[in-house]
């Protein structure tokens, strides 16, 4: 049984804070260690360009976010961890998807609609300050997901639309050019941890109420001391309901620790003492990671090497897959022309190659006809590049390649002529 492929994007537009850690980094790192899961994590620096026009900020954010995830335990050997802009196949796929995505679909995108509604409400031109990047943002996100045929994409409920739009793009492309993409599914956690900030509102850079994830001990203690509390004196019972301090503590503490602080609230613990308890609990978890983070942040060359290695791993899949997609849409070598006929013929459903990874870690592919019937099945390859090269040989040389690759193929499910006809159909598109 093949593994389930998860994909997570991280926009490089700010410095990670405790809310990011509790809501995304910590659960994602834990999930990446699950057996039978193939995880892709990417730094979405192309996406950041839509929000940020400060080059230094994007570069610094990329460094800080990469260092934060690595310090929190993300294993680049176990997962594929890469920078979006290091995989040129992604913007190329964006264009292919742009050509099958209706403008009406993009008109309904939440970010674009919100910008238009805001302008309309203030009497401005609906598209004032709306860039093509903002409008096309869902297509780029679709390319991120579909390039690696992710099965599951963890998102909040407010981001489900992005996955639905990626599914639409996949289905549109598959309808026109054959089955190439797996329509992704949104993975929604029943309860995503959301931390309150210093002022009690959701911890967010927008409210400037965050606690940086790897603030120094001194800064962490100072920021925690600034958490807004009520005026109840020491000895007066205090409510845990609505207490930002208690909610933050709960996100880090065990059930027993939480119960102990709840009892202390009931007994009238002083706010200063409660803040000290919170500081010590957070620092106990963060301190080991802080040391690792500082080591990484002061060695950007090490992070760069990790990201480039991750990009190379990602491109082992992306490059041969993109070659298949280019061929599918007609971006082919003229020497591969299968017919001189100039008459327009009706579009027919084509056979297709499907490449995937099994639980044993090996990469395989199969050739199916337009109805999904299995025609050809490979044995396992050590890398997706090797599998992609075999597919390319079959597409180029047809049945001749079947002889050359016979030691890497399962016994045929059908006769050789049927497979040969399918390969010729795939090569010519007719």
Tell what function each PLM region has.
Residues 397-429:
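Short, mixed-charge low-complexity intrinsically disordered segments
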Residues 373-383:
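A short, exposed loop/beta-hairpin motif centered on an aromatic-Gly-Thr core
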Residues 382-399:
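A short, charged, amphipathic alpha-helix used as a generic interaction element across diverse proteins
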Residues 2-7, 12-142:
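N-terminal Rossmann-like or analogous alpha/beta NTP/dinucleotide-binding catalytic cores
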Residues 362-367, 394:
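Short, structured motif recognition centered on aromatic/hydrophobic residues
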Residues 16-22, 40, 44, 54-61, ...:
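Structured ligand/cofactor/substrate-binding pocket environments in proteins
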Residues 161, 170-360, 370, 374, ...:
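Conserved nucleotide- and phosphate/pyrophosphate-binding catalytic cores
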């Amino acid at each position: 049984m093949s593994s389930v492929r998860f994909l997570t994007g991280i926009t490089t537009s700010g410095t990670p804070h405790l809310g990011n850690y509790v809501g995304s980094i910590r659960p994602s790192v834990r999930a990446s260690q699950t057996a039978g899961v193939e995880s892709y994590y990417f730094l979405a620096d192309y996406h950041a360009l839509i929000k940020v026009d400060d080059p230094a900020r994007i570069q610094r954010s990329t460094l800080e976010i990469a260092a934060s995830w690595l310090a929190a335990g993300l294993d680049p050997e176990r997962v594929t961890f890469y920078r979006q802009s290091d995989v040129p196949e992604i913007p190329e796929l964006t264009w292919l998807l742009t050509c099958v995505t209706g403008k009406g679909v993009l008109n309904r995108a939440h970010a674009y609609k919100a910008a238009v509604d805001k302008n309309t409400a203030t009497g401005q031109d609906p598209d004032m300050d709306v860039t093509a990047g903002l409008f096309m943002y869902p297509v780029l996100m679709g390319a991120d997901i579909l390039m690696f045929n992710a099965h599951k994409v963890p998102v909040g409920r407010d981001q489900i639309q992005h996955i639905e739009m990626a599914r639409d793009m996949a289905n549109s492309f598959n309808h026109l050019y054959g089955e190439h993409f797996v329509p992704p599914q949104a993975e929604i956690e029943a309860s995503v941890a959301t931390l309150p900030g210093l002022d009690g509102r959701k911890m967010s850079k927008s409210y400037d109420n965050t606690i940086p994830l790897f603030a120094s001990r001194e800064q962490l203690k100072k920021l925690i001391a600034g958490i807004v509390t009520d005026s109840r004196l020491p000895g007066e019972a205090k409510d845990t309901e609505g207490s930002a301090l208690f909610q933050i503590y709960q996100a880090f503490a065990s059930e027993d620790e939480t119960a102990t602080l709840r009892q202390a609230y009931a007994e009238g613990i002083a706010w200063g003492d409660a803040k000290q308890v919170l500081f010590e609990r957070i620092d106990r978890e963060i301190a080991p990671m802080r040391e690792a983070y500082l080591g990484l942040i002061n060695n950007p060359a090490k992070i760069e090497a990790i990201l480039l290695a991750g990009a190379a791993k990602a491109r082992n899949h992306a490059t041969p897959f993109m070659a298949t997609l280019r061929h599918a849409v007609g971006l082919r070598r003229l020497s591969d022309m299968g017919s001189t006929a100039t008459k327009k013929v009706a579009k027919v459903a084509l056979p297709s190659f499907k490449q995937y990874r099994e639980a044993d870690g090996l990469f395989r592919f199969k050739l199916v006809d337009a109805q999904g019937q299995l025609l050809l099945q490979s044995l396992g390859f050590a890398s997706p590049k090797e599998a992609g090269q075999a597919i390319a040989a079959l597409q180029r040389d047809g049945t001749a390649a079947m002889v050359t690759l016979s030691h890497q193929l399962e016994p045929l499910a059908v006769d050789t002529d049927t497979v040969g006809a399918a390969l010729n159909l795939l090569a010519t598109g007719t």
